[in-house]
Regions:
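N-terminal Rossmann-like NAD(P)+-binding domain of SDR-like oxidoreductases, especially those catalyzing
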Residues: 1-161
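NAD(P)-dependent short-chain dehydrogenase/reductase
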Residues: 115-118, 140-203
Length: 203
């Protein structure tokens, strides 16, 4: 929505755009305004060809596995969809020879356990999960390519942020959905995992 409001032509990718539902684009009312294409971000040729065909000025990498708990069950998926995919995109940009701004979605999970101290850009990384390790690795790849090739490559370190579009497996959506079920009489208890975990949330 933000980029569209700035007059951008926005192209969104999915592994299989022809069968993907793009539910969130529909909920936001921008489904018809975004061009949808198929890209496998783990495949160099797929990414390279897309960049050559569509010639973007900017690339925003928001893809990849996004659950800390799931990353322990599927650690390889975390590495491939975050670290490997970031490297492939960076290398594809470099190989085209085009000047393209690149934004990578980072994560506060890079910091890991900060002993209850707030984290900022000067805080050392100490990731504690496959997800955090993958995001930290991607961060360093972006920094390395930026320094080496002198291009506008950056990582935004995102802390927990909430949205009605967030999947139901995340804690806030889980709480809301269970409260609705309790109100409707289909549930009578709310089950949560580690209730000692502390998080800040943005919107």
């Amino acid at each position: 929505n933000f980029l569209l409001s700035k007059g951008y032509e926005v192209i969104g990718s999915s592994r299989d755009a022809e069968i993907s539902q793009f539910t969130n684009l529909k909920k936001l009312g921008i489904y018809e305004k975004v061009k949808k294409i198929s890209i496998s971000i783990n495949d160099f040729e797929s990414v390279y060809n897309a960049i050559n065909i569509y010639k973007p000025n900017e690339i925003y990498n928001l893809a990849g596995q996004s659950s800390v708990s799931l990353s322990f069950e599927q650690p390889l998926e975390s590495i491939e969809s975050i670290t490997k995919a970031t490297l492939i995109i960076l290398n594809a940009i470099r190989s085209t020879g085009r000047i393209i701004k690149f934004y990578s979605a980072g994560s506060s999970e890079c910091f890991g356990n900060t002993n209850s101290m707030p984290a900022d850009e000067k805080t050392s990384f100490n990731p504690c999960s496959p997800y955090g390790i993958s995001k930290a690795s991607a961060y360093w790849l972006v920094k390395s390519f930026r320094s080496t090739y002198q291009q506008y490559f950056c990582t935004g370190i995102l802390f927990n942020h909430e949205s009605p579009l967030r999947p139901k497996r995340f804690v806030t959506q889980k709480i809301v959905q269970t409260i609705l079920k309790i109100k409707n009489g289909s549930e009578n208890k709310l089950y949560l995992g580690n209730i000692d975990t502390k998080r800040d949330w943005g919107w």
